[in-house]
Amino acid sequence: MDLTDALTLFKRLGVNVPSLSAKEFSLAYYRLAKRYHPDHGNNAGHNLMANINAARATILKAFRRRN
C-alpha cells in the first residue's frame, strides 16, 4: 500500500492524518481497531482490519522518515 492509499483509507474512516502528531495518530488507530476488529463482532471483518493495519504501517514509516 502506498502512502496516498493509506491516507485515503484513514480519511474515509474519519481520521485526517496530516493534522495529527504520531501519538495522536496512534490513538486514532486504536479507536479504529476497537471499532472495526472482527473479534468485536464487526461485520466488516478481516479484510477491513487488514487494510487498516497495512495503512497504519505505511503511515508510521512516513512519520519515522519525517522525524
Residue ranges and their predicted role:
Residues 46:
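Short, well-ordered alpha-helical segments
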